[in-house]
Amino acid sequence: MKISVVYAAPRQPLLFDCRVAEGSSVAEAIEHSGVLRYCPDIDLSKQKVGVYGKFVKLDSPLKEGDRVEIYQRITRVLDEDDDDDD
């Protein structure tokens, strides 16, 4: 079945279209897509994944046409001043 894997890389979003076996999981699709070779900084033990904007687990099964999304980790940066705008 045909699926897509999308990663919002720091410099530019990456899109990988690939074919996987029926019943493949999110993790299998990510591995098969090749995105991990292009972006070795991806850490699936820390980053969340989703399908069409909804968080899913790595073992979730996919359907034809699904778009797997690997989300960037969000970090909060505190400024050093005394205001409450953090």
Curated annotation (Swiss-Prot):
SUPFAM superfamilies per the UniProt record, alphabetical: MoaD/ThiS
InterPro entries noted in UniProt: Mopterin_synth/thiamin_S_b, RnfH, RnfH_sf
Domain of life: Bacteria
Gene3D superfamilies membership: RnfH-like (3.10.20.280)
Pfam families xref list: Ub-RnfH
Protein family according to the UniProt entry: Belongs to the UPF0125 (RnfH) family.
Protein name (Swiss-Prot/TrEMBL): Protein RnfH
Source organism of the structure: Stutzerimonas stutzeri
Gene, per the UniProt record: rnfH
